[in-house]
């Protein structure tokens, strides 16, 4: 296994400008760099995900890892207000050409990239020049949410399903040409792309990623990989790494990849379903309780808080104009603000798990999130919403079984059907503003408004074409 550390979700003290802090980080990085160099690694990618859902990077030679860990690598604050097309907006707190931040690699999550010989990758946290946490750092926001749960004696385990469409390589303006036309979920797709899928499994394994399933999905050329649950920040890191890996393996096979919510309008899109379970000690609060389907009271209140905030959460979990080409009824996208046991049309699907499988089986799935989401924003905001529900001792409404679209109109509330509607809910969410803090909250708001304006008047086909190869 190539990951330097298998730590799931460690909490890190914020690095400071102290000589002792820099020396400690430098010593760890020096040892890590020596090991990487001996393994043939020449460069290290430091990555973070911006508010439009795009992974941005800086790279350093392996000999520069020590300096990067001690002092950071410069990056402009304006990355917080980049749009999906690389244009830049501004917000009340963040934007403009002035200022600089430091990217500090998380050495506990550094991994040698199996599909990119000579390269390693590490997620980066962003700090101000004085060593204080950057208020717009999405990864540190997720960590703060985890810490807020831990102060209540609670821990969470999470996993994000990664769905993607694979197509033959070609110019970015061209629509996808699929390398397999086999049936949805069909063995033909595995046969047609056998070597490709095998190389993916090998790369995941070499990087220490615990794959649960890899299988064809519904849309043309679509596949899904799901991984074992881990701490929420680690799960977000894993999602970024998995996407990198899929893209790298695909390129080696003459293929290109889209994680976009809508690759082709009218077809099933790429989801980013978030699975969460809430724990107190060794007890999974999603089972063996006295609430609905075995939920403990704390788990019910947590999920009720998530359900109540889902319209606002969509601005983070379904963040693009294209997201609402995917989020439609009767596509298993979770377009209704309801919950139900094993209901794939509900935005919040309760998964009790097979009887007798063990305490790790029960979890909840948020189905309305998609592949455009920044995973750190998604997990951090969902935790914040759940904790607000727990603090308010909310209860779940009546469950919904079957297809909500088959109910009388208005009986089951629809989630926002456009980014404009989601942004309106987000703007009014006191829970999310308090959790994210004004600088991050406002930066997200600025990006969403700017992308709404960017795609104003575009047809669904034009929106899909403009975003298809951006994610």
Residue ranges and their predicted role:
Residues 212-232, 238-248, 316, 454-471:
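Long hydrophobic alpha-helices with heptad-repeat/coiled-coil character
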Residues 157-168, 175-177, 184, 207-227, ...:
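Core alpha/beta catalytic barrel or barrel-like domain that forms the active/cofactor pocket
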Residues 2-213, 411-471:
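ATP/Mg2+-dependent ligation/transfer catalytic cores
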Residues 226, 231-232, 324, 342, ...:
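Intrinsic-disorder/low-complexity, polar/charged segments
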Residues 19-22, 26-35, 42-43, 47-150, ...:
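Active-site capping/gating regions of soluble enzymes
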Residues 178-190, 228-236, 285, 290-292:
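Glycine-rich tight-turn/loop motif centered on a GG-T
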Residues 56-57, 169-170, 224-226, 270-272, ...:
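Short secondary-structure transition/capping segments
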């Amino acid at each position: 296994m190539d990951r330097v550390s298998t730590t799931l979700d460690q909490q890190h003290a914020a690095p400071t400008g102290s000589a002792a802090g820099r020396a400690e980080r430098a010593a760890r990085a020096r040892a890590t760099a020596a090991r990487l160099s001996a393994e043939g690694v020449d460069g290290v990618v430091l990555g973070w995900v911006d508010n439009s859902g795009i992974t941005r990077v800086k790279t350093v030679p392996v000999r520069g890892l020590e300096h990067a860990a001690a002092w950071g690598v410069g990056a402009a604050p304006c990355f917080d207000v980049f749009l999906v097309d690389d244009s830049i907006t501004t917000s009340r707190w963040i934007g403009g050409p002035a200022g600089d931040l430091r990217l500090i690699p998380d050495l506990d999550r550094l991994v040698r990239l199996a599909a990119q010989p000579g390269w390693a990758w590490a997620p980066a946290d962003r700090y101000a020049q004085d060593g204080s946490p950057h208020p717009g750092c999405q990864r540190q926001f997720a960590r703060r949410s985890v810490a807020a749960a831990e102060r209540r004696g609670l821990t969470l385990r999470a996993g994000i399903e990664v769905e993607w469409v694979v197509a033959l390589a070609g110019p970015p303006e061209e629509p996808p040409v699929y390398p397999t036309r086999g049936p949805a979920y069909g063995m033909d797709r595995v046969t047609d792309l056998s070597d490709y899928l095998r190389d993916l499994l090998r790369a995941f394994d070499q990087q220490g990623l615990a794959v649960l399933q890899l299988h064809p999905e519904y849309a043309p050329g679509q596949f899904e990989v799901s991984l074992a649950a881990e701490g929420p920040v680690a799960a977000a890191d894993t999602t970024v790494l998995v996407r990198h890996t899929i893209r790298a393996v695909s390129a080696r096979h003459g293929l290109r990849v889209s994680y976009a919510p809508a690759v082709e309008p009218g077809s099933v899109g790429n989801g980013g379903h978030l699975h969460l379970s809430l724990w107190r000690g060794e007890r999974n609060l999603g089972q063996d309780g006295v609430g609905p389907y075995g939920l403990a009271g704390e788990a019910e209140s947590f999920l009720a808080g998530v359900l109540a905030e889902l319209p606002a959460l969509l601005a983070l979990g379904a963040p693009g104009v294209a997201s609402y080409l995917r989020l439609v009824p009767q596509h298993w996208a979770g377009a209704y603000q309801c919950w139900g046991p094993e209901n794939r049309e509900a935005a919040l699907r309760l998964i009790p798990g097979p009887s007798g499988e063990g305490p790790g089986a029960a979890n909840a799935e948020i189905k309305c999130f998609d592949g455009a989401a920044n995973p750190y924003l998604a997990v951090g905001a969902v935790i914040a919403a759940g904790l607000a529900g727990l603090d308010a001792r909310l209860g779940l409404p009546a469950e919904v079984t079957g297809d909500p679209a088959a109910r009388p109109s208005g009986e089951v509330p629809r989630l926002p059907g456009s980014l404009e509607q989601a942004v309106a809910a987000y703007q009014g969410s006191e829970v999310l503003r308090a959790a994210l803090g004004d600088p991050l909250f406002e930066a997200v708001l600025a990006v969403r408004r700017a992308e709404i304006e960017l795609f104003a008047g575009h047809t669904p086909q034009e929106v899909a074409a403009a975003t298809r190869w951006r994610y």
